[in-house]
Amino acid sequence: MRTLALLAAILLVTLQAQAELHSGMADDGVDQQQPRAQDLDVAVYIKQDETSPLEVLGAKAGVSCTCRRFSCGFGERASGSCTVNGVRHTLCCRR
């Protein structure tokens, strides 16, 4: 599987290099004062409205969930992850 991923990465880099070479030849007649798309810095921020896992699991009767730093305790099951102060933890739930 790693070999396949490595070969795919090499193929993509090769294709990108060829595309840049061909676009460089085509752009020789273009005014050098115009910025190219690759020269522009773009920042994209995406924010989604999400329901927290605690709200989803807490809606079921008899479910109690806790954010744990390491692993779930006896009788608890890992049900996802949660973030506390920017640190990702394990979401452990008990029925």
From Swiss-Prot:
Q: Which residues are connected by disulfide bridges in this protein?
A: 65-93, 67-82, 72-92
**A GO term from the CC aspect:** extracellular matrix
Q: Which residues form a coiled coil?
A: none
Q: GO annotations under biological process?
A: antibacterial humoral response; antimicrobial humoral immune response mediated by antimicrobial peptide; cellular response to lipopolysaccharide; defense response to Gram-negative bacterium; defense response to Gram-positive bacterium; disruption of plasma membrane integrity in another organism; innate immune response in mucosa
For this UniProt record, give its keywords in alphabetical order, as a comma-separated list. Answer: Antibiotic, Antimicrobial, Defensin, Disulfide bond, Secreted, Signal
Bilayer-spanning residue ranges: none
In the record, which residues are listed under signal peptide? 1-19
Can you say where in the cell this protein is located? Secreted
Q: Which residues form the propeptide?
A: 20-62
Give the principal location in a single coarse category.
Answer: secreted
* A Pfam family: Defensin_propep
Q: Which InterPro entries match?
A: Alpha-defensin, Alpha-defensin_C, Alpha-defensin_N, Beta/alpha-defensin_C
For this protein, the record's SMART domains field holds: Defensin_propep, DEFSN
Write down the superkingdom of origin: Eukaryota
PROSITE patterns membership? DEFENSIN
Family, similarity comment: Belongs to the alpha-defensin family.
Described by its record, this protein's role is as follows: Microbicidal activity.
Could you tell me what this protein is called? Neutrophil antibiotic peptide NP-4
Q: Which organism is it from?
A: Oryctolagus cuniculus
